[in-house]
A protein has these predicted regions:
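Polybasic, lysine-enriched low-complexity intrinsically disordered terminal tails
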Residues: 1-5, 102
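Active-site recognition of the HExxH zinc-binding catalytic motif
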Residues: 63-72
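Short, positively charged interaction helices/loops
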Residues: 96-103
Length: 103
């Protein structure tokens, strides 16, 4: 179950991925390299972290979160497999009506 780090911070939460606790941060565009929408640390990092640009919305945000979660769970998997799988899962969830709810 994902949990917000603090009730006051809607841009951070923790969750288990691949059996490890991960920090998920929704960051400003300037906090992440301009050539990416999100990134994923390594599971062996002291505080494994996924960063997602706040500016990404809708189905693209869903795809991005799934993409980075797949990297966290399967760090040795190819980018091609992660891209394809994340997009297919996001398309399925979107078609089933899943949408982001403001907390």
């Amino acid at each position: 179950v994902a949990k917000r780090k603090q009730k006051q911070d809607p841009n951070a939460l923790t969750t288990k991925l691949g059996g490890k606790e991960w920090h998920i941060k929704f960051v400003r565009s300037r906090e992440i390299p301009s050539d990416r929408w999100g990134d994923c640390g390594h599971p062996e990092d002291p505080q494994p972290t996924i960063r997602v640009r706040r500016a990404v919305e809708g189905k693209n945000r869903m795809d991005l979160i799934i993409h980075e979660a797949l990297h966290a769970i399967y760090p040795d998997e190819t980018e091609e497999m992660v891209n394809r799988s994340a997009t297919e899962i996001a398309n399925l969830l979107w078609a089933c009506g899943y949408r982001r709810v403001e907390m």
